Amino acid sequence: MAGQRISVLQRARMQREMRKESRTGKMRNSMKQTEQRMKTRWILVFLAMLVCFCGWWAVRKEGFFADELYSYGLSNSDYAPFLSWYYNGERAYSGTSAEHIYSREDFMSYVAVQEGQRFDYASVYYNQTQDVHPPVFYFLLHTVCSLFPGSFTKWTGLGLNFALFGGTIAALYALGMEIFEGENSWKKSLFVCALYAFSGEAISNATMIRMYMLLTLFTTVLALLLAKALRRPTLVRYLLIGIVIYLGMLTQYFYVIYAFLLCAVYDFYLMLRREWKHVVQFSAAALAGVGGMMLTFPCWLAQLHSQSTVSLDTTTDNILNLSQYPKGPLELTGWSIVEFGVGAGIMALLLLVALTKRFLPGKLRQTVLIAPHAKLITIPALAAFIVIAVISPYKSLRYVYHLQPLEALFCGCGFFAVLDTLGQNARKKITQAVCALMLVLAFVLTPERMYIGNRKVNEELEQYSDAQCVSLIGDMTAFTSELPEYLHFKEICAVQDTSSTLLREYCTGESDSMVVFICGRGLWQFVTPGEVEQITQENQASAEEIARLGGYTSVEMLDTQEFSQIWVLKK
């Protein structure tokens, strides 16, 4: 009986201990779940803050680049891709407009969706067949603008870009989680996101209303899908890669360079592992994406031959021109160093470590700076940068904006590989210093195409809203670049030169003042100060001639802009 009582007591004690352990386990699981939820919320808040930072700069954007106005026109104009089409002008890209008196409504019809034209994707598709770019970005911009018919504002385009920027940041974070290992992988991924988002290139990309932000999203998503396929290749992932390639090529043709290099490297990787089934599946999916683009937008070949500056012929000339090889990459690299800021400094450090590795202390000497899987994703991006720098028609960073998230990932991998050789306190202090420097430079360095000062010019033009207005067209890009300023006036007399009969009929001298826009004549963002002075003298002579026609005695220049000068004539 005593033995039975002891056995009962032991069982009771064991049951109490098991219940206690169960409660403790549940509490631990609950605490882990709470910590995970808090970490997820913190990550989402941080990523949202990066997007909001771009909004801080977007508020300061006061003007439009000519190509941004083409974005609105090609998206929203009803079967008329360029202003030169409105009055039987030359129906070609950047053609010459017929002389005509444009009304304010004409310009609004070009850049804003009108009632009855909302969600008209057939018009958008048609407009893009007459342009030099595929249509996906313009479909999206038209969709956003269709929600606000009759409105022309930077915020429709910037709002779209913010959504695309947020998607890019999220994809970059997920890509970092695929590449980095260990319990701090999420912190390293956030660092890479910040390194990208706080760079001048990223902010310039997010605040430029063109297809490059969408191109960046598709580039990052392609890298993410392939990184996942490296860990666990599946047919579904290959099909998704094919879809992303299809959409990317329908966004901008330079997408094919990184996509081709990345796919070639991955195919070679699979061949080395003798995974022939995956070689066939992956290659078929990727080629299906390319073929789908060719079938759904068959005018791609004509577009690649449609201009003297943006064509396959120019690309071939640039490839064969040996002087391009040091010039193009070095020129673009120099600009990228300034815009990338801290990232460029990290890349220089990695280059220095790689060159002097055998002379460094043992732990750093044995460190692998870039892991093999990270190399497979990022090295094609660096190679694509060089290729684009050689073949691009203009040496502009916008053609390589889409590669920068992968450059940031490359820098992040090398940065943490070096840091991991140091002590914990040193790692913490260096990381904090680098993050602080990133934040400071992000506020100090002004992104491209902010046009700070245009607001003041527009306020001054508003004072002359009742005055007559003349525009010497020059070329259509220059003429289009002044569209936001034209909206201050009821009508604009657009002529080719001062000998125009229409100009002489228009200059009646009825108003006390006249505003004259003189467009083109070689004036644009890359001319030297000496050339600007010479062009200004020619423009002043034209303004004085118009003043004589209208009986005006005072001729003053109001502003010099990228493609034109604004003159005010008074009696």
Where are these regions (language model features)?
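Specific aromatic-rich, kink-prone transmembrane helix
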Residues: 143, 171-174, 194, 198, ...
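Transmembrane-helix motifs of polytopic, lipid-linked glycan transferases
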Residues: 156-182, 221
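Signature aromatic-anchored transmembrane alpha helix within multi-pass, membrane-resident enzymes
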Residues: 1, 45-48, 287, 415-446
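Perimembrane helix-loop-helix junctions
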Residues: 223-240, 245, 257-291
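Membrane-lumen/periplasm interface segments of specific transmembrane helices
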Residues: 268, 272, 278-318, 322, ...
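Transmembrane alpha-helix segments characteristic
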Residues: 190-192, 240, 245, 285-291, ...
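Hydrophobic/aromatic-rich transmembrane helices and adjacent perimembrane loops
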Residues: 67, 379, 391-423
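Interfacial juxtamembrane loops and adjacent helix segments
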Residues: 78-133, 145-150
